[in-house]
Amino acid sequence: MPKMKTKSGAAKRFKKTAGGLKHKHAFKSHILTKMTTKRKRQLRGTSMLNKSDVARVERSLRLR
């Protein structure tokens, strides 16, 4: 049987770390003029994936 392929879209969006799965924030690509500076600042950087979504993303990344 051939190897299972990783979902390439998931591979681009999530990174496996020792603490869990890391991801970037959504809603930060365009039409940012309506958004407050505080909100744009809060959406910077990365955060850890919610526990309820981990199983689904791990299946997409073929970690499970």
UniProtKB/Swiss-Prot annotation:
Residues 1-28 have a biased composition (Basic residues). The keyword Ribosomal protein applies. InterPro entries: Ribosomal_bL35, Ribosomal_bL35-like, Ribosomal_bL35_CS, Ribosomal_bL35_sf. Keywords: Ribonucleoprotein, Ribosomal protein. One of its GO terms (biological process) is translation. PROSITE patterns: RIBOSOMAL_L35. One of its GO terms (molecular function) is structural constituent of ribosome. It comes from the Bacteria. Signal peptide: none annotated. Residues 1-64 are annotated as: Disordered. HAMAP family: Ribosomal_bL35. This is Large ribosomal subunit protein bL35. The gene is rpmI.
